[in-house]
């Protein structure tokens, strides 16, 4: 585990300090949950220089539009993961996909279980893909609401919302404000 910096951004220097010859894989979330911060392409490229596999979890990609998937053709040690849980409403069905260099994909295909997607998940996935235009229009509505909510939260005394690229907003409450809201 690598602590993020005071702005909840990825701390590359801290990640490098934790890296040693036993480190084989590093997971990075982008957008990060609960902060909604994006890992920059330059930060990911810097991590890719280390002798390990970098997995970037882009579960909230559809809400951010920010991705490092284009780097997979350049870096054999990069895996980008996506899920249908958030934008397509398939949480709990364990349906997603990975974007990676063909060499890694071939290796993973050799070691994966033969039936790695359940029937319910597959059926839901196919139905979702048939109506992806509708689902993506819902994503746009959520993005609009996120912006509206962020603006409203900025006007509440004692509440400091953090900008987010996810479908959520992290808020900081002034002292005892969280207790007041809880009792509310």
Regions found by a protein language model. Give the residues of each.
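Conserved PLP-binding catalytic core of the aspartate aminotransferase-like
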Residues: 142-143, 155-184
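Short, well-structured N-terminal submotif of metal-dependent ribonuclease cores
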Residues: 68-77
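Short glycine-rich anion-binding loops that position phosphate/pyrophosphate groups of nucleotides
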Residues: 31-34, 86, 167
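PLP-dependent aminotransferase class I/II
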Residues: 77-155, 159-162
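Hydrophobic residues in well-ordered beta-strands that form the structural core
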Residues: 1, 28, 56, 80-82, ...
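Structured helix-beta-strand junction loops
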Residues: 21-22, 50-51, 74-75, 111, ...
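Active-site phosphate-binding strand-loop segment of PLP-dependent enzymes
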Residues: 4-62
């Amino acid at each position: 585990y690598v602590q993020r910096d005071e702005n909840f951004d990825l701390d590359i220097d801290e990640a490098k300090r934790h890296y040693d010859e036993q480190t084989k894989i590093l997971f990075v979330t982008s957008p990060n949950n609960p902060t909604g911060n994006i890992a920059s392409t330059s930060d990911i490229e810097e991590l890719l220089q280390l002798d390990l596999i970098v997995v970037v979890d882009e579960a909230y990609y559809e809400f951010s539009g920010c991705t490092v998937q284009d780097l997979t053709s350049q870096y054999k040690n990069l895996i980008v993961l996506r899920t249908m849980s958030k934008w397509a409403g398939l949480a709990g069905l364990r349906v997603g996909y990975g974007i990676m260099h063909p060499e890694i994909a071939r290796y993973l295909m050799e070691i994966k279980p033969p039936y790695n997607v359940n029937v319910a998940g597959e059926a839901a996935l196919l139905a979702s893909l048939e109506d992806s235009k509708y689902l993506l229009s819902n994503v746009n509505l959520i993005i609009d609401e996120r912006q509206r909510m962020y603006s409203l939260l900025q006007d509440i005394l004692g509440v400091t919302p953090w900008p987010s690229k996810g479908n959520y907003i992290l808020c900081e409450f002034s002292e005892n404000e969280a207790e007041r809201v809880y009792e509310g």
